[in-house]
Amino acid sequence: MNRYDLIIIGAGPAGLSAAISAAKNGLSVIVFDENSKPGGQLFKQIHKFFGSKEHKAKIRGFRIGEELLKEAEELNVTVVLDAIVTGLYQDKEITVKIGEEICHYKGDAVIAATGATENMVPFEGWTLPGVIGAGASQTMMNLHRIKPGNRVLMLGTGNVGLVVSFQLLQAGCQVAALVDAAPKIGGYGVHAAKVARCGVPFFLSHTIIKAEGGDRVRGVVIGEVDSSFQLIPGTEKHFDVDTICLAVGLSPMSQLLHMAGCKMQDTPLGYVPVIDENGATSIPGIYAAGDVSGIEEASSAMIEGRIAGAKAAEYLGFLSEDAAEETTAELELALDRLRKGMFAPENRGKKITLTDEGIPVSESLLTKGYLAEDELDRFPGIAKGKGIHPVMECTQNIPCNPCQDACPRKCIKIGETITSLPVIDEENTCSGCGMCVASCSGQAIFLLNEEYEPGYASITLPYEFLPLPVKGDTGTALDRSGKEVCQAEIIEVKTLKAFDHTSLLTMKVPLDMAVKARFYKSGGCSHE
């Protein structure tokens, strides 16, 4: 039987982070993963992460995965792929199917970082080819470079549904609509806004009635639901689509912990093990980290993994109690920073009407996916100024502050609490470098110059689509809802290594469109 100080099940963000944390303290570590590639969800996450520097903010998920893998390899962590753990027992022994062979491994401690699986929603036609999970579509696009379909309807407006919808657009798919039975958008408003300004409509208080097609998806019918989520007759709407993506939540894959005899509980986060603040289960030496203990963001999973790795090192005597306490206290503080604001775990299901600063939230953002013009003036980041200046359409208390760190002239302030709304420091002058625009994980910052030339303004916006426009191109400016508003001319295209594949387009629009225009589309304006 093969023996290791620590066995980790799952090579995703939590598992790799736990392995690194433990190996740094001298433990022999082996990690098993059922997939052919390590990294879990990270390698299909091409978007930039939120948080602060300590949470790897403004770094794309797949790059974080590469960093974790490299660090694990340098620490001589053994990673076994295509390895299905079929059993976990109280004595910390596991059985693993590798190829056609069943292998036995014994650890002095075990960390389960098995993640979660996508939920499905049954409806008429839900087993037709073309009905897929949002995560599956991410795998197809970002790992295998395959378009899931040509015209897609997305069910679910949490962060997964919003992020994947944007990535579908980047892949060249048409997104017919985002649909959700809830009356409000569930994910970050900045994610919704970048989808809305591409012209994608939201249908809230709606659900899928049926998928149409004999051999595959050829259409979908949705309908409105009442406050009890019952279908309202006569509200049916039809869309011609060939793909239906489901982003309706995740369920923790906690079966192995249950099998081991860990105490379990049903919670709003799923069927999860009972753990303490350090991830320790009811069985000494067995820990849980990441989505297996409750669904959160990958940033949280990485910190939970590091905590579990440190506590396993303490449990086995590789780390003193004082050193472990110091390490975990710092990590718990970082985790706590991520769990603040409107989307904090304790706020799930609550109706939030005011920001932490006491500002009324944008109802338009929650119900339509974009800010209404009559709501703009209430938010501190959307300030008028002379010459070129940033306009920050970040209006919810979400954990993120890269813009503050990116600005070389300190024009942007967020403060110690990373969920605070960004504000403009009027004592400092914007240079127009665009670092804040490129660093914003939510693509919610623009540079505005209403004095560009008589009768015209310039707007610099983030752009992550191909083909990339070139200077001199003329096209159409779209407003926050994706509506065509005027003709636009590209006057500058900036692409730097520091921007990490977020190009900056600067377009010239009529002065009266400076407050409206927020996106660029190649081709003429149908209203001209």
Predicted regions and their residues:
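Short, solvent-exposed secondary-structure boundary/capping segments
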Residues: 495-509
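Short beta-strand-centered aromatic/proline hotspots
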Residues: 483-497
